[in-house]
C-alpha cells in the first residue's frame, strides 16, 4: 500500500479526525485539497511507533516546513531592512523563527489539539513541550506548501510572523523564562528552582509583588510585577540571564 493510500485509509476510518481537521481548515482559512498532508502533519513519531498502520510521521513535513519558514523570513527581512548586513539579518532571522515565537503562534492556533501522540510520550512529555509545539507549526507549514504551493504558504506564515518581522524585539515578550530556567536548572544542577514571595504592596486593584527565585544557595535573583506570575517570570528572566552569562 502506498504512503498516500495508507494514510488516507487511516484517516477515513476516523470520522472524529475528519471533523477535527475540518475545524483546523476553517481556523487557518485554507481549504485543504489533499487532507492527508495535514493529517500527517500532526502524527508524532511516538504515535506512529504504537500504530502499525501508520507509515509516516510528521518529521519530514517538519523538515520541509522549517526550510520554507526560513526562506519566507529571509525574504521578508531582506526587503524590510535594506541597509542591514548579513550578520544583522541572520541574528534577526534566528530570533523571529525561534522556538518561543513559533510556540506562541502554535499555542494561539491551538495546534496541539490536533496532535496524535503516543501514550508513552504523553506520560513522559515535559520540558520538550514548547519545542514540540513549535515543531507543529513547521510541519503545518510543510503541509500547506505541498498542498497549496509557496505563495499560499508564504501568506499564511506572514499572517502570523509579520509582527515579529516589523518588531524583532517583540520576541522577548513571548519567552517563558520560568520554563527555560527550570529546564536549565534540571539539566545542569539536577534540581528545580524555588520561588518565594518576598513582599506584596499596594491597594487590591494595583498590587505589586516582589518574588525571589533561588537555585540551591548558589544562585538567587528577584523580580517584581503586578501579579505573582509576572513577578516570577521577571525573577526567572533575571536569574536565567545571569547564569547563562557566567556558565
UniProtKB/Swiss-Prot annotation:
GO terms assigned for molecular function: double-stranded RNA binding; metal ion binding; ribonuclease III activity; rRNA binding
Job description of the protein: Digests double-stranded RNA. Involved in the processing of primary rRNA transcript to yield the immediate precursors to the large and small rRNAs (23S and 16S). Processes some mRNAs, and tRNAs when they are encoded in the rRNA operon. Processes pre-crRNA and tracrRNA of type II CRISPR loci if present in the organism.
Pfam families recorded: dsrm, Ribonucleas_3_3
Catalytic site positions: 66, 138
Superkingdom per UniProt: Bacteria
RNase III domain mapped to chain residues: 21-149
Protein known as: Ribonuclease 3
Enzyme Commission number: 3.1.26.3
Biological process, per Gene Ontology: mRNA processing; regulation of gene expression; RNA processing; rRNA processing; tRNA processing
Broadest EC class assigned to this enzyme: hydrolase
Originating species: Leptospira interrogans serogroup Icterohaemorrhagiae serovar Lai (strain 56601)
Cofactor: Mg(2+)
Key words, A-Z: Cytoplasm, Endonuclease, Hydrolase, Magnesium, Metal-binding, mRNA processing, Nuclease, RNA-binding, rRNA processing, rRNA-binding, tRNA processing
Cellular component annotations (GO), alphabetically ordered: cytosol
Amino acid at each position: 500500500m502506498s504512503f498516500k493510500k495508507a494514510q488516507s485509509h487511516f484517516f477515513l476510518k476516523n470520522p472524529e479526525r475528519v471533523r477535527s481537521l475540518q475545524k483546523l481548515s476553517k481556523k487557518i482559512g485554507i481549504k485543504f485539497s489533499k487532507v492527508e498532508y495535514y493529517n500527517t502533519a500532526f502524527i508524532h513519531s511516538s504515535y506512529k511507533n504504537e500504530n502499525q498502520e501508520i507509515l509516516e510521521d510528521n518529521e519530514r513535513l517538519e523538515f520541509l516546513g522549517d526550510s520554507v519558514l526560513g526562506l519566507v523570513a529571509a525574504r521578508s527581512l531582506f526587503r524590510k531592512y535594506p541597509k542591514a548586513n548579513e550578520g544583522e539579518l541572520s541574528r534577526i532571522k534566528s530570533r523571529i523563527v525561534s522556538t518561543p515565537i513559533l510556540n506562541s503562534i502554535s499555542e494561539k492556533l491551538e495546534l496541539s489539539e490536533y496532535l496524535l501522540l503516543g501514550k508513552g510520550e504523553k506520560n513522559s512529555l515535559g520540558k520538550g513541550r514548547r519545542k514540540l509545539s513549535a515543531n507543529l507549526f513547521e510541519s503545518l507549514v510543510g503541509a500547506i506548501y505541498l498542498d497549496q504551493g509557496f505563495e499560499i504558504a508564504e501568506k499564511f506564515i506572514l499572517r502570523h510572523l509579520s509582527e515579529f518581522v516589523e518588531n524583532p524585539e517583540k520576541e522577548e515578550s513571548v519567552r517563558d523564562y520560568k520554563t527555560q530556567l527550570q529546564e536549565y536548572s534540571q539539566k545542569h544542577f539536577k534540581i528545580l528552582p524555588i520561588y518565594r514571595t518576598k513582599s506584596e504592596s499596594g491597594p487590591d486593584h494595583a498590587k505589586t509583588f516582589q518574588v525571589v527565585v533561588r537555585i540551591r544557595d548558589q544562585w538567587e535573583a528577584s523580580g517584581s510585577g503586578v501579579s505573582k506570575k509576572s513577578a516570577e517570570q521577571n525573577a526567572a528572566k533575571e536569574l536565567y540571564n545571569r547564569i547563562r552569562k557566567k556558565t
